[in-house]
Amino acid sequence: PLRNLHEKVGIAARDEWLYDHINYEQEDGTYRQQFANTMRQIEDLVDDVPIYIWYADNADEQIGVRFILYLLREKTNDMYIINSTEQYEKYCVNKEQPIDYTSQMDSEVLKVLFEKNKETGPLSNEKRIQLETEWQVLSESKDMLRIWLDNEIKGMPEHYFDSFIMQTIEKIHKEQGTTEFINTGFVIGELLEQLNASVNIFFLEYRIRHLIYSGQLELKGIPKSMRHYSVRLR
């Protein structure tokens, strides 16, 4: 959930939802601490330095750039945004695979792209206001899932991927010629290969657990992480 995430009440609501639904493979509280540290760093940015924000063509980073710009709305710094997906496709001729996330690029690639964008001007006030307003719209939504589709952030029902998960497990059963249990991590790997969208693996794992609890999938193991249990169709 993103509702009112720029306020303490929204942060608390998101923390509670993640704690109840998502199996992050890290210590409890790590995400909350990282988020709090990031918010503090944004707040402490001094006013006399330019700010560069990198983002790629996925829902996480497209939402993130709008969220950060909203948090920085009172700052007078020059703001620069760099779409790493567009720049990678434009300048990295020898690319071996598509880039879904900025974090997939190594430092040398980022350096090249930064140099290529040095002459680009800062965001205009109009563009900043537009992106800040888009964040406000997102923060008023009750959607639990958003995807990047047709160059837009689109809210989807929480069960959006459920039928695809079921179809993928059925496909694996047919390919293996058996209905034996399949490791959940393997299922998620297959899902990511077939999806034309960048999807958070922990959200997919949450939906698999939902399909177990609703009686559509059978479980073997303890679902404390995607590596620790297997599933099959009932």
Task: Tell where the protein language model's regions lie, with residue ranges.
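A short, conserved structural fragment
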Residues: 212-223
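Short acidic, hydrophobic short linear motifs in intrinsically disordered regions
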Residues: 176-194
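A short alpha->loop->secondary-structure connector
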Residues: 67-81
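A conserved mid-domain beta-alpha-beta active-site/ligand-binding segment of alpha/beta enzyme cores
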Residues: 97-182
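Short, cationic-aromatic polyanion-contact patches
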Residues: 222-234
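Short amphipathic alpha-helical interaction segments
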Residues: 197-213
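A structured, charge-rich N-terminal accessory region that forms the first stable segment of a protein
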Residues: 1-33
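Long, hydrophobic/aromatic-enriched structural stretches that serve as scaffold segments
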Residues: 22-67
